[in-house]
């Protein structure tokens, strides 16, 4: 990718994902997500799945149904990483719910065979993939989506030292490294996303 900010933004997001697994965050959610944009078959989905070591792959899913709101919220407590595959297929009717889910630090739900409602810890972070470039439809802003263009085929054959990778992430958290985005970083993300913004219908008609 040609995005000079990608390495830093992904690093912060990765630390936040790890922090959620270790229950270091109770008041805020990992409310941003990397959104990989590129042609079909370039290795986006495999790259997302490979972020988790084989021992944790059971906590990865690329199947979430936003029309079933209760199940979608409960997935936050059951999975470590949720990939919104084919992001542009998410109906605009569910965009506000998606934003709400991204920002949820806990899920209030009744456990099976329990009477009282409990606040369940959120473990899941989100990532997404898309084949099309005009994918952002919300005109109110896109600071939560770290859109990144895949300019070639991703090399997914490189072996990853997961033990070392996550040991470094945990060490960074213990040393107090920041795992949330500043307002300046969010502003930069919004500016970068302009190229991925879908034009309003009236503008599309005007340009025809």
Where are these regions (language model features)?
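P-loop NTPase catalytic core of nucleic-acid-dependent motor ATPases
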Residues: 1-77
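Feature primarily recognizes SF3-like P-loop helicase cores of small DNA viruses
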Residues: 29-32, 58-61, 67-94, 100-102, ...
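Short amphipathic alpha-helical segments and helix-helix/interface helices
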Residues: 48, 98-99
């Amino acid at each position: 990718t040609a995005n000079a900010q990608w390495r830093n933004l992904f690093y912060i997001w990765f630390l936040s994902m790890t922090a959620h697994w270790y229950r270091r965050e109770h008041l805020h959610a990992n409310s941003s997500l990397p959104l990989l944009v590129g042609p079909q078959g370039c290795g986006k989905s495999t790259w997302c799945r490979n972020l988790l070591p084989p021992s944790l792959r059971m906590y990865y899913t690329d199947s979430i149904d936003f029309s079933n709101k209760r199940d979608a919220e409960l997935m936050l407590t059951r999975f470590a990483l949720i990939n919104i595959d084919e992001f542009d297929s998410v109906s605009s009717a569910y965009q506000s719910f998606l934003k709400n889910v991204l920002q949820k630090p806990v899920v209030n739900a009744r456990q099976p065979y329990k009477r009282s409602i409990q606040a369940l810890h959120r473990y899941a972070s989100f990532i997404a993939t898309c084949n099309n470039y005009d994918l952002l439809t919300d005109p109110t802003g896109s600071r939560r989506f770290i859109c990144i263009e895949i300019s070639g085929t991703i090399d997914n054959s490189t072996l990853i030292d997961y033990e070392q990778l996550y040991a470094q992430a945990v060490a960074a958290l213990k040393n107090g490294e920041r795992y949330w985005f500043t307002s300046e970083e969010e502003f930069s993300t919004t500016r970068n996303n302009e190229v991925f913004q879908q034009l309003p219908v009236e503008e599309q008609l005007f340009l025809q």
